[in-house]
């Protein structure tokens, strides 16, 4: 919900799982959120940009979180396609 100034005033804004598009509930304590840093290709240094991925507890419980993060990183161009 937004006020007249356009600022969010909700106490809780739910996240969505990056792999399955499920809403991550407030009581899903098995979910994770990870920031993957983007690195300069020449110098190998962090360039102040990152991608954020949220993985719900159901994906982690199935053991698919590592494959999901790798697939998302390949789609975003963080990891090369032939890795």
From Swiss-Prot:
It is found in: Cytoplasm, Cytosol; Cytoplasm; Rough endoplasmic reticulum. InterPro entries: Ribosomal_eS21, Ribosomal_eS21_CS, Ribosomal_eS21_sf. Pfam families: Ribosomal_S21e. One of its GO terms (biological process) is endonucleolytic cleavage in ITS1 to separate SSU-rRNA from 5.8S rRNA and LSU-rRNA from tricistronic rRNA transcript (SSU-rRNA, 5.8S rRNA, LSU-rRNA). Keywords: Cytoplasm, Endoplasmic reticulum, Ribonucleoprotein, Ribosomal protein. GO terms for cellular component: cytosolic small ribosomal subunit; rough endoplasmic reticulum. One of its GO terms (molecular function) is structural constituent of ribosome. Transmembrane segments: none annotated. Component of the 40S small ribosomal subunit. Component of the small ribosomal subunit. The ribosome is a large ribonucleoprotein complex responsible for the synthesis of proteins in the cell. This is Small ribosomal subunit protein eS21. The gene is rps21.
């Amino acid at each position: 919900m937004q006020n007249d100034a356009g600022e969010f005033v909700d106490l809780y804004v739910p996240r969505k799982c990056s792999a399955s598009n499920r809403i991550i509930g407030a009581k899903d304590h098995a979910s994770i959120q990870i920031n993957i840093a983007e690195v300069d290709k020449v110098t190998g240094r962090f360039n102040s940009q990152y991608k954020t991925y949220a993985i719900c507890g159901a994906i982690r419980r199935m053991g698919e979180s590592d494959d999901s993060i790798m697939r998302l990183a390949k789609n975003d161009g963080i990891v090369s396609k032939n890795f």
